[in-house]
């Protein structure tokens, strides 16, 4: 082994011969061909050269060594690679130090030794080390042959190993130290230990290998880690076995308790069976070392046997089952069927099981619920539900909705507990959707509502803006039925909301929908502030919306813009030139004066508001207008407020729902989506929604249908109440819809019976609009704490046969708290009743005074249409309210602007006389129309 050829060494290193010759020449070893022999010194020189060239610090080199065996099976060569191991190769410096130490042990160097003797001694030591390595390899081979297949040696002969990654064959060095690696699992259990022991030297003269202190410490550390890992695995296995034993014991205990309770109930009490399984499982918890891999394998095998019945394999499977059956007392039964499973019974256990009690469910019943959903909540079949309802006289299907009362009766009849659930609130459902899908808020166009008196030029202003900015040059303008449109300006887009009257605007505010961002208040410069103007200001302030005042008709000679500013200042609308915050723009809708300045002011207000809305989210909006089209069905104008509305979305609007089949913009063009503040016409709803209804997109069609049906049932009573309110004698039935006022009272009496009787009598006075709230009642005099409670709650104090002390009276006088003293209970009840009556709103009744028939319509320029009429019934007064009726349909409700007989203004005209009259703010009258005159009378109400 000491002399090998270059070609053999290159094959061992798996490198070309030319590269090896080149490296040998660079290392100072002169070799010319592959047949030249290599000595041990040549290899050491090559190793030292390559170590320096590769930048190594001269430390130990680790090489992964594998053993490859080639065998011939049926004429085919088969290459088998066995498990590799890591060999630590010392550097040249370490090797030289080991050789020197070996020389020192073999023969101490004499002081007078010459240089030639030292060289000879080193050569002899190297030869002895090589001979010792050969002897160790031969001894290991002999022991491996004796051990046979029981334990394979983990350390292979150095001559049979091949280095995979190292460029040099350092494994042929004479003094190779024994590596210390982590042992395999079978070696940890004591197998193959003899193979790991180094062979004894063949000749006693050969010295033992030298092991450095650092390497010995490394070996000890690895041994300590292996022992710690082994102990940790054993502890985990022991803990697992203990946990499994405890689980089995608890399971047995629970089964025994259940069995004892069942026997006690049926009257056949038996002694409880002692717990045997925990004792049987006790040996598994013995403190003995267990191989983790073997334990895991056995545990997996046991689980497979328990889960799939693998113990019954082989010829003796049947006998094994019979033996197990006999061990269990013979109580093993086979279920019917092709794959009949064994029903294992405990000893002395009967196959008959007592019937369990029926499970009682607590069912939450909403306002409306389908038969199938109710059956699912009670865990019964739908057929049983339909049968129970048919016995009640209701012929329903499984998909039909039933009301809450009926559902509660059926739930109780079937033996379950029914409780009314909270109503499904669509707003709460919408809030959940918004929380689940939060989108980034982006700037959106402002929504502007134009308000004001009809005669002040509101319609003309909208027409001019529409004609000038929206469809310039298009014939016919925009679609006339839509109530909203947007205008593009150089500074941005503005969406105008054109709702007839104030009903939709008020409905939006009542529902809390912020549909309008800015209000343009139109006031005629020649007319001044009218009652409807004041009403519009109140609406805008209630909504917290900024106002931009457009003073119209400044082109008239009688225009006085300064008077408009003064009148609006009285209603807290102060111009910005006067130190206020409201912009005033003088415009002319007829000539188009300052229209651009008005739009500029609106965009300035919108910029201050910083209006934003999420775009990538389900759409929410408000219904501006809705109608029933003959060819297209229900058509609704929707103003999108948040999100993006897309074609095909499931929309819910009030009691109507449906998938959007088509979307049309204000120009009549078909579109597929609309973003925030964009109005669209939509088709596909199941019914015509009301103006002002909130609309939202839901992902679930079932949820949309459920909410729509719930709203239909909820609003049914409201619609009936509205129909009853049309009758004069049933006006009181509509009182409960308004928010009730509260009268807070604190009662102090001399005895307990007095304040209990007084509190009970006062609570009976509560009505739909006014309720009595007894905050506190007690026995004794009136104290400062009672007065402080009255101050905080705004209540007044009733003292029944008691008085207040001096400090309480002084505090009540300073804080304006009313204290009333009574000795008779009826006086207290009458005073509280009178106070509650004063809190009631007066009752308003319409009293019809006369009927007028229009027989002629006269059009006068700059004045309007004048109606020539005949009073057919009653009397017509100048200050009467009128109702215009055409074909038995009410067209308009308003007031009279003037009433004349011939050319004289009169206060009233009686039946049988002719008269001429004009309607205030309305000119669309025709011959044959009828006017119904009525007065509104307020009547004080009492309890």
Curated annotation (Swiss-Prot):
Subcellular location: Cytoplasm
Alphabetical keyword list: Cytoplasm, GTP-binding, Initiation factor, Nucleotide-binding, Protein biosynthesis
Location of region: G3: 498-501
Region annotation Disordered: where it falls in the sequence: 99-354
Positions with a binding annotation for GTP: 452-459, 498-502, 552-555
Location of the region described as G5 in the Swiss-Prot/TrEMBL record: 588-590
tr-type G domain location: 443-612
Low complexity compositional bias, start-end: 99-113, 145-172, 200-215, 251-264
UniProt family annotation: Belongs to the TRAFAC class translation factor GTPase superfamily. Classic translation factor GTPase family. IF-2 subfamily.
Protein name: Translation initiation factor IF-2
């Amino acid at each position: 082994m000491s002399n090998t050829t270059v070609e053999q060494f290159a094959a061992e290193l798996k490198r070309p011969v030319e590269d090896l010759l080149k490296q040998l020449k660079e290392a100072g070893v002169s070799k010319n061909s592959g047949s030249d022999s290599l000595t041990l010194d040549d290899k050491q020189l090559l190793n030292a050269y390559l170590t320096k060239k590769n930048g190594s610090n001269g430390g130990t080199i680790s090489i992964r060594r594998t053993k490859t065996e080639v065998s011939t099976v049926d004429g085919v060569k088969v290459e088998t690679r066995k498990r590799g191991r890591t060999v630590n190769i010392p550097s040249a410096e370490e090797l030289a130090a080991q050789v020197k130490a070996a020389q020192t042990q073999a023969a101490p160097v004499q002081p007078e030794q010459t240089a030639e003797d030292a060289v000879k001694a080193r050569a002899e030591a190297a030869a002895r080390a090589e001979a010792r390595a050969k002897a160790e390899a031969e001894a290991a081979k002999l022991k491996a042959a004796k051990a046979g297949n029981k334990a394979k040696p983990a350390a292979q002969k150095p001559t049979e190993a091949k280095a995979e990654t190292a460029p040099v064959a350092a494994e042929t060095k004479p003094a190779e130290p024994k590596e210390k690696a982590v042992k395999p699992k079978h070696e940890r259990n004591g197998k193959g230990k003899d193979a790991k022991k180094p062979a004894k030297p063949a000749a006693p003269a050969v010295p033992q290998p030298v092991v450095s202190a650092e390497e010995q410490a490394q070996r000890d550390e690895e041994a300590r880690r292996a022992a710690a890992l082994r102990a940790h695995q054993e502890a985990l296995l022991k803990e697992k076995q203990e946990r499994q034993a405890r689980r089995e014991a608890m399971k047995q205990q629970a089964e025994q308790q259940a069995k004892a309770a069942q026997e006690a109930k049926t009257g056949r009490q038996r002694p409880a069976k002692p717990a045997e399984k925990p004792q049987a499982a006790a040996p598994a918890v013995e403190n003995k070392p267990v191989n983790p891999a073997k334990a895991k394998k056995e545990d997996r095998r046991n689980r497979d046997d328990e889960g799939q019945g693998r113990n019954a394999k082989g010829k003796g499977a049947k006998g094994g089952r019979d033996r197990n059956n006999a061990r269990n007392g013979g109580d093993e039964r086979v279920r019917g069927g092709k794959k009949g499973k064994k029903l294992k019974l405990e000893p002395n256990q009967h196959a008959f099981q007592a019937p369990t009690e029926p499970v009682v469910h607590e069912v939450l019943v909403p306002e409306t619920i389908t038969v199938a959903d109710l059956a699912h909540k009670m865990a019964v079949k739908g057929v049983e539900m339909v049968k129970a309802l048919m016995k009640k006289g209701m012929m329903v299907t499984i998909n039909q909705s039933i009301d809450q009362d009926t559902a509660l009766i059926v739930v109780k009849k079937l033996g379950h507990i029914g409780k009314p659930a909270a109503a499904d609130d669509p707003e709460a459902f919408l809030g959940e959707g918004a929380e689940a899908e939060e989108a980034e808020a982006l700037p959106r166009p402002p929504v502007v509502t134009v308000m004001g008196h009809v005669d002040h030029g509101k319609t003309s202003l909208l027409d001019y803006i529409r004609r000038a900015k929206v469809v310039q040059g298009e014939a016919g303008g925009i679609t006339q039925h839509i109530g909203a449109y947007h205008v593009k300006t150089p500074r941005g887009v503005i969406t105008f909301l054109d709702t007839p009257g104030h009903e939709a605007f008020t409905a939006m505010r009542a529902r809390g929908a912020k549909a309008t961002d800015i209000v343009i208040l139109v006031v005629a410069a020649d007319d001044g502030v009218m009652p409807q103007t004041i009403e519009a200001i109140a609406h805008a302030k209630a909504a917290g919306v900024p106002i931009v005042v457009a003073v119209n008709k400044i082109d008239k000679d009688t225009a006085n813009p300064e008077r408009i500013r003064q009148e609006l200042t009285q209603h807290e609308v102060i111009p910005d030139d006067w130190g206020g915050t409201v912009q005033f723009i003088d415009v002319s809708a007829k000539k188009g004066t300052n229209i651009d300045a008005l739009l500029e002011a609106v965009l300035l207000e919108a910029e201050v508001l910083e209006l934003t809305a999420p775009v990538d989210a389900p759409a929410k909006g408000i219904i501006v207008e809705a109608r029933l089209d003959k060819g297209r069905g229900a058509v609704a104008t929707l103003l999108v407020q948040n999100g993006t509305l897309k074609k095909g979305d499931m929309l819910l609007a009030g009691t109507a729902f449906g998938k959007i089949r088509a979307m049309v913009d204000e120009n009549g063009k078909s579109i597929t989506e609309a973003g925030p503040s964009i109005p669209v016409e939509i088709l596909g709803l199941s019914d015509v929604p009301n103006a002002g209804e909130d609309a939202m997109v839901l992902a679930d069609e079932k949820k949309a249908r459920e909410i729509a049906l719930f709203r239909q049932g909820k609003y049914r009573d409201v619609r009936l109440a509205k129909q009853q309110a049309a009758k004069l004698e049933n006006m009181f039935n509509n009182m409960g819809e308004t928010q009730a006022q509260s009268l807070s009272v604190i009662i102090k009496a001399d005895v307990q019976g007095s304040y209990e009787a007084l509190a009970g009598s006062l609570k009976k006075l509560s009505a739909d609009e006014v309720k009595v709230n007894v905050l506190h009642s007690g026995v004794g005099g009136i104290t400062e704490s009672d007065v402080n409670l009255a101050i905080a709650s705004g209540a007044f104090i009733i003292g029944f046969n008691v008085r207040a002390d001096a400090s309480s009276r002084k505090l009540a006088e300073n804080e304006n708290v009313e204290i009333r003293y009574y000795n008779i209970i009826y006086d207290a009840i009458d005073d509280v009743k009178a106070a509650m009556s004063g809190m009631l709103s007066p009752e308003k009744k319409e009293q019809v005074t006369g009927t007028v028939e229009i027989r002629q319509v006269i059009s006068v320029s700059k004045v309007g249409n004048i109606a020539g009429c005949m009073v057919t019934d009653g009397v017509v007064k100048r200050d009467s309210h009128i109702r215009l009726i055409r074909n038995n349909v009410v067209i308009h409700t308003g007031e009279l602007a003037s009433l004349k007989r011939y050319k004289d203004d009169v206060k009233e005209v009686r039946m049988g006389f002719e008269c001429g009259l004009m309607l205030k703010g309305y000119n669309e009258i025709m011959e044959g129309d009828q006017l119904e005159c009525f007065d509104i009378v307020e009547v004080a109400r009492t309890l």
